[in-house]
Structure formats: structure tokens, C-alpha cells
């Protein structure tokens, strides 16, 4: 019996070698927190900050991922606080119940299309500019404002380094 010199055909059609239908994952195919949005390929930085604007937890997602998707994993990393202040992008029943279960008061304005309205402390909500100032300080560094790093791990490492400096 003569063996074919084209051994790759055996694997391609279910012969010897890899099991049929099984493929090697693409190199670099793991999540690199790059998403497509109107502005092109982007990365979204989710952050928890304390009352002085120091980042306590950071998370990266693709730019096309909704803000609410990063909220619970980020909040689960830290102990519960008295209040959690967030913008309208975080107004969801499941997040409010998650915060209530932790004993935290959500200070989140209602979305315009919300049927059931929740009261929120507008004076406390004014403190939300602390996180906006934190993002401004972080993005003063060009490497953060314009993501040059290919991998999410390297970008997050640079972000953590800069957050420690700010």
C-alpha cells in the first residue's frame, strides 16, 4: 500500500490525525478586548474609584460591549460600599437588585424609557464627576488614550501602572 505524500489531506477529511471537525484555535484568538464601534476598533475601560478618585478596580471590554456587562464582575471584586454612583448606562433592574443584595444604595438616574421610576439622591450624583476626572487623568497619557498595545494584558498592565501614579 502506497502512502500519500499529502498527509494534510488525511486530517482535513477525517483520516488519521486530528479528530474529524476538530480545529486548532487561531493564535491570538483569545479575547483581546477590542470591539468594533462607530469610531473603529476600540477598547472600553471600566473602573471603580474611591471618593478621592483613586482607581480600585479596572476591567477592559471591547468598545461594542454595553457598560452594564462590566458592572457586576467589577463590583464583585471589592467589598460593598455605602453608595454606588453610576450613570444611566448602568440603570438595569438586575444591577439594582445586585446592589441591594450587597447592602449598597444605588445612586443611578433613571433611563428615559424606564416605566418603573426609582428615586435617587441628586446631590450624591453630583459626585459622579470624580470618575470622569479620573478618566481624564488616565487619558492624559498617550498610551492609554490611543491604545498601542496589541494584547489586553499589556494594555491593562500599562493602565494599572498609570493608575498607581495618578
Predicted feature residues:
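Short alpha-helical elements
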Residues: 1-166
Amino acid at each position: 500500500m502506497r502512502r500519500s505524500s499529502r498527509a494534510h489531506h488525511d486530517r482535513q477529511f477525517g483520516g488519521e490525525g486530528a479528530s474529524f471537525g476538530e480545529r486548532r484555535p487561531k493564535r491570538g484568538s483569545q479575547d483581546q478586548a477590542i470591539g468594533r464601534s462607530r469610531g473603529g476598533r476600540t477598547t472600553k475601560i471600566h473602573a471603580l474609584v474611591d471618593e478621592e478618585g483613586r482607581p480600585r478596580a479596572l476591567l477592559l471590554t471591547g468598545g461594542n460591549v454595553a457598560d452594564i456587562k462590566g458592572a457586576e464582575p467589577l463590583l464583585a471584586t471589592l467589598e460593598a460600599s455605602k453608595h454606588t454612583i453610576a450613570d444611566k448606562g448602568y440603570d438595569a433592574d438586575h444591577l439594582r437588585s445586585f446592589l441591594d443584595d450587597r447592602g449598597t444604595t444605588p445612586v443611578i438616574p433613571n433611563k428615559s424609557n424606564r416605566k418603573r421610576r426609582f428615586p435617587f439622591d441628586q446631590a450624591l450624583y453630583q459626585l459622579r464627576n470624580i470618575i470622569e476626572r479620573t478618566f481624564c487623568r488616565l487619558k492624559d497619557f498617550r498610551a492609554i488614550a490611543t491604545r498601542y498595545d496589541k494584547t489586553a494584558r499589556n494594555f491593562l498592565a500599562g493602565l494599572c501602572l498609570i493608575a498607581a501614579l495618578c
